[in-house]
Amino acid sequence: MVRISRRRLLQTGTATIGTAGIAGCLGQGGGSLDSITVAYVPIYPNMQHFVMQKEGYYDELSIDVTVERFSNGPSLVKAFASGDIDVAVGGLTPAMVLVDKGTTARVLTANGRNAFKVMATAEIAELYEQAGADAFEQFEAEQGRKIRFGAPPDGSVPDIVLRYWVERDLGIGEFESAVTKSKINPAKSVQTIQSGDIDATMIMEPFATIIGRDQTMAEVEWSGNIFPGHPMTGMFVNQQVREATDVVRSLVDAHVEATQFVESNPTTAAAHAASIIGSGVSVDLAEAAMGSQAADFISDPREIVDQTETMSEYVSEVGNINEPIATENLFAFEPYDAVQE
């Protein structure tokens, strides 16, 4: 976990490093909101966060902002649930898990939608192009085994989209009976599929772009065709931040500005993403991924509500939450509406 502390430029006239720790994030005993901790996972769909950090949008808030990096979603969820972070830039399904377990988490903005591609061996891609949904049965008949998919853990956003594709879009039966799934970290998907340990993956950018450059691999489908408008990540906050009207409106306003920045300055935004993500994501790769259908960045939370409800049903079915989460318990629309007035 990496921590970067900043202090508002407009207050001090210079950029200084804040020293507020987690214990002082929200003041004690219900006091005023003096500072917030923003946590993120360094994945490409969190593009607005990279812009907000590199372009100094967090600096322009009226409070101290501490930015913390988490290596994965589960660790971010644990920190949010324990009160160690106040604002999270992460997946919508982790937010559902938090709410299900009694932690207040309200989604203020979307980050993106339609964020995955099904990448597979060229053999499977060709078979799917010819046979469609029947490709799964044909492959098993020819190879004596099911297609092996690699994807993050059950209940994650890509896992849910993969299940939706198999069960609802293609209608080929229950997920577990149709494919064999291995749980893999997205960053390891390229190595895993190229080594032959899996046949296909539901994967985000820029890893889809890397796999697509391999002539032995090909794109099978885009998640925007599978589950149109499905969410990926968003910005969600705890109750204390939610009640700080000026702060949440400022956060949402900065997010909207970041989305506009991505649209008008995609090359610079890609460079910002590469500089923060690291881990083999070069500027050239980040720029190339900007041209992908799976790079669709938005802020308006209402654009993903219906799809999030469907996704919540699936998260419940795999057992990550007890029951689907009601929209009013997951989203807070007022801040976005206010900055649009």
Q: Where on the chain are the PLM-derived regions?
A:
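N-terminal secretory signal peptides and thylakoid transit peptides that target proteins
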Residues: 1-21
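Short, polar/charged alpha-helical segment
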Residues: 42-70, 74-75, 96-101, 160-169, ...
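Secondary-structure end/capping motifs
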Residues: 245-321
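A conserved helix-loop-strand patch within extracytoplasmic ligand-binding domains
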Residues: 111-184, 239
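Short helix-initiation/N-cap motifs at beta->coil->alpha
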Residues: 44, 67-78, 91-93, 174-195, ...
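Conserved C-terminal helix/tail region of periplasmic/extracytoplasmic solute-binding proteins
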Residues: 312-341
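Pocket-lining segment of extracytoplasmic ligand-binding domains
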Residues: 185-275
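Short, well-ordered beta-strand elements
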Residues: 31-43, 63-68, 146-150, 180-182
